[in-house]
Amino acid sequence: MMKVLLSGGGTGGHVYPAIAIANKIRDEHPDAEIIFVGTEKGIESEIVPKYGFELKTVTVQGFKRKIDFDNVKRVFKLFKGLEQSRKIVKKFKPDIVIGTGGYVSGPVLFNASMGKIPAIIHEQNSFPGVTNKILSKTVTKVLTSFEDSHKRFPEAAEDKLVFTGNPVRKEILLSRKNIARKNLSISDEKRMVLCYGGSGGSRKINDAMRLVIKNMVNEDIAFIFATGKSYYDEFMGSISDINLKPYQKVVPYLEDMANALAASDLVIGSAGAISLAEITALGKPSIIIPKAYTAENHQEYNAKSIEKQGAGIAILEKNLTPESLNTAVFKLLGDRELLVDMANASKTIGKPEAIDLIYDEIMKVYNSTQKSTSKKTKKEKVIKEVKEIKKETTPSIEGQAKVIGIKKR
């Protein structure tokens, strides 16, 4: 039976790739034993159990970029997380460990590497994080989502890098527009816009969306807008004077991404790598608003890549206003031919086969490990049998004494 340990957390961008990988393994190996390692406060504590997987939690937090007392406390949490991860790995005895990013995956991958357990990193972004760069030297394999990210890894990891793309959840890949619209009670004739600012929401996008929502209500356009849980009450208070119709929904968090994405004609969102993988897998035109504070400014790079290929429009946060977003939305909705061209461009970027490529690489590592283990076990068995034969054919010291002590007659 295959035993797999996955770790990734903090944001949906790290959790959902792990879910996609776990689902693929479970589909191919129904008897596989799969567990996740995350934190109690991370979004993984809500998402992982919903997909029917066991979640073990550890205490760990990411570091702030400035040096302060809070960072000192986080150092102690890191050591605690390392010890907790070590115990989980030791007890579960996984055949393979897979990390999909977020601060929680670091201690897990580190302990796997130190324990000589095959370990794989999946890097979603074009600019790998510091932890993944360091661990890439010790893990078995590094799966990447952007080919140009390879130049940003250490030279010691060069032979371990494999370009696979970002995995998209099966329910999204299998979703269809007509069925999704029926599920959401949205007629085929209506134009429909989906907007979300990542798993935690975006205040910048929320501020700009108030005007857009007002005008979409006036134009009788269907929409689903996810504000982020922490912003929901505030946002709903700010649009209390607007009467929404049943097919015009504002929600704190998007539980059913598959139907919402499939039903849409236009998507507005941030430039997280997984969000873009999902958008392009279904061939959706988009308005991409990269978050400005991301590491290495990788979201801006992602957004400009989408725009350069004609699949979307990028609006930087510093240029985002209610008016600029409203203009972009209604220009696109008013030009069906342009939307179709953008949709086709988006579809060519999408990599729906990524999950199969990732699974193949995982199985290569797993199978090679099993062969090595089998050879080792066979060798140990042979050595044991040789020792037994030698023991049976070699007289003991006591036996030798008795033989020497026999007197000749």
Curated annotation (Swiss-Prot):
Instruction: Quote the record's binding site residues for UDP-N-acetyl-alpha-D-glucosamine.
Output: 11-13, 125, 169, 199, 299
> What EC class does the entry list?
transferase
Q: Which SUPFAM superfamilies match?
A: UDP-Glycosyltransferase/glycogen phosphorylase (SSF53756)
UniProtKB keywords: Cell cycle, Cell division, Cell membrane, Cell shape, Cell wall biogenesis/degradation, Glycosyltransferase, Membrane, Peptidoglycan synthesis, Transferase
Function text: Cell wall formation. Catalyzes the transfer of a GlcNAc subunit on undecaprenyl-pyrophosphoryl-MurNAc-pentapeptide (lipid intermediate I) to form undecaprenyl-pyrophosphoryl-MurNAc-(pentapeptide)GlcNAc (lipid intermediate II).
Q: Which PANTHER family match?
A: GLYCOSYLTRANSFERASE (PTHR21015:SF22), UDP-N-ACETYLGLUCOSAMINE--N-ACETYLMURAMYL-(PENTAPEPTIDE) PYROPHOSPHORYL-UNDECAPRENOL N-ACETYLGLUCOSAMINE TRANSFERASE 1 (PTHR21015)
Its name, as the record gives it, is UDP-N-acetylglucosamine--N-acetylmuramyl-(pentapeptide) pyrophosphoryl-undecaprenol N-acetylglucosamine transferase
> Where does this protein come from, organism-wise?
Clostridioides difficile (strain 630)
